[in-house]
Amino acid sequence: MQRTLVVYNIYVARDENSKKAYLLEEDFTNFLTDLSKQSIVDRKKNCAQEHKILYLDSFEHQKEEHILNVRMRSARYASRRNVIDTETMKSRGILKRENDGDEETNHLGLKFIDEENILVLFESNYYGIGFGRIVHYWESF
């Protein structure tokens, strides 16, 4: 399966109330820690219009390097197709239930560069979930 790496450079909006990127690193790590303590059902979000669910699978914080590695999972459901045995060409029928999903994984690497810049390396794939959906997922908690 083809995967594409996309780079985002996020600039922290600066005003007298803005946090520095390193403080954002600590806050975001704490957020992911709290989120990962929830049951998988509680941290799952449904993207009904796309027939997908999305959830935080895991993350790793490399504190000395100011790097967060995040693994998100998604699953597309409501897609039920007839399955055939490609050797015998006999139909095996529909093997999935309506709620069964095809699981995909997206990885993100976040590097907190300095007080104002966060570099994000996002692994994109056609069947996975987009970066905007992941940001929306985080904002929903």
Where are these regions (language model features)?
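Intrinsically disordered, low-complexity polar/charged tails and linkers
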Residues: 1-109, 124
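A short acidic, glycine/proline-enriched capping/turn motif at secondary-structure boundaries
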Residues: 77-79, 115, 127-129
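A short alpha->loop->secondary-structure connector
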Residues: 117, 128-141
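Glycine-rich, often proline-containing surface loops adjacent to acidic residues and nearby aromatics
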Residues: 111-123
